[in-house]
Regions:
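Hydrophobic residues within alpha-helical transmembrane segments
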Residues: 10-13, 63, 95-99, 118, ...
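Transmembrane helix-loop junctions in multipass membrane proteins, especially transporters and channels
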Residues: 23, 27-31, 84-85, 113, ...
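Interfacial loop-to-transmembrane junctions
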Residues: 100-125
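Core segments of transmembrane alpha-helices
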Residues: 64-77
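N-terminal signal-anchor transmembrane alpha helix
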Residues: 1-42
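A loop-to-helix transmembrane entry motif
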Residues: 54-67
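Helical transmembrane-bundle signal
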Residues: 12-22, 74, 78, 101-104, ...
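Juxtamembrane boundary at the C-terminal end of a transmembrane helix
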Residues: 87, 129-136
């Protein structure tokens, strides 16, 4: 397995960890009666994520943000893998992406401004660098 595919697998596991963190925080915040309900707007009045306190809501947003970033990172890994273009540079970019995504969660949770945005930017640059390195 290439380093990029290894990092992709680890990024998917990170998504699972983020899901667990967000789920536990949401259940502690809102209670099982709401989180295990059918979540009908007419019954609850608004979506569950809008009812969350600040910190659980941040975990929710970080979780969703990783879905968005993971889509592009997956594209980058597929491009590198199918082109058989894995290099030390693309491998380093993949690890940088994962490090940035790991750092992003506490940065978002603790509201670290401007660090959260800078961490996101590092991961995004690493992702696009993988694609560009494969194309040139």
């Amino acid at each position: 397995m290439t380093p990029e595919l290894t990092v992709l697998a680890l990024a998917a596991l990170l998504q699972g960890v983020q899901f667990a963190l967000m789920s536990v925080a949401a259940n502690l915040d809102l209670g099982m009666a709401k989180t295990a309900s059918p979540r009908d707007i007419d019954r609850l009045g608004r979506p569950l994520h809008e009812m969350l306190a600040t910190k659980p809501a941040r975990l929710y947003r970080a979780f969703n943000n990783h879905f968005e970033a993971l889509i592009l990172f997956t594209v980058a890994v597929v491009v590198v893998s199918l082109a058989d273009a894995s290099t030390p540079f693309t491998a380093t970019c993949a690890w940088v992406y994962l490090g940035a995504r790991i750092a992003y969660v506490p940065a978002y949770y603790f509201g670290l401004v401007p660090w959260r945005s800078l961490i996101f930017f590092v991961g995004a640059v690493a992702t696009f660098a993988m694609i560009l390195a494969t194309l040139i």
